Amino acid sequence: MATAGMLLKLNSQMNREFYASNLYLHLSNWCSEQSLNGTATFLRAQAQSNVTQMMRMFNFMKSVGATPIVKAIDVPGEKLNSLEELFQKTMEEYEQRSSTLAQLADEAKELNDDSTVNFLRDLEKEQQHDGLLLQTILDEVRSAKLAGMCPVQTDQHVLNVVSHQLH
């Protein structure tokens, strides 16, 4: 059974997923404004994935008798200048969420809370896939920049990379 402290940390992680979904929607909007529609579509799908993770955490917490609390968040509003900057930001955010998720899993293991450990390890596996995809995209965006591709060409390249990775 999850301890009260663990449940508070799970609640915080759930809110990180909520923040990530909002961040990805914000970044998607920026891409749409730049006519980078392939990347915008990818980021909206990532936002949906984060909402799904958030709901899984919400449901897990309810199943163990907790009362999850989704908190209000500040809307991300940073100015972006490039796809490279955008994907660097997504990687930084991903690494923060991934790190705290791993810490939670380790802590649950120390508490011998097997159901929480199993739940968190499943989430970690899913997030690792997302992290590999984001890193691949960032690497490809950097390569496209070095090759002199314009943003619209890079956007199309990102869409091709995502399509290839998902199939």
UniProtKB/Swiss-Prot annotation:
Q: Which domain of life does the UniProt lineage start with?
A: Bacteria
Span of domain Ferritin-like diiron: 1-145
Supply the InterPro entries for this chain.
Answer: Ferritin-like, Ferritin-like_diiron, Ferritin-like_SF, Ferritin_DPS_dom, Ferritin_prok
Q: Please give an example of a GO cellular component term from this record.
A: cytosol
Q: What's an example of a GO molecular-function annotation for this chain? A: ferric iron binding
Q: Which UniProt keywords apply?
A: Cytoplasm
Q: Which PROSITE patterns match?
A: FERRITIN_LIKE
Give the Pfam families listed for this entry: Ferritin
Q: Which family does it belong to?
A: Belongs to the ferritin family. Prokaryotic subfamily.
| Protein name in the entry | Bacterial non-heme ferritin-like protein
- Gene that this polypeptide is encoded by: ftnB
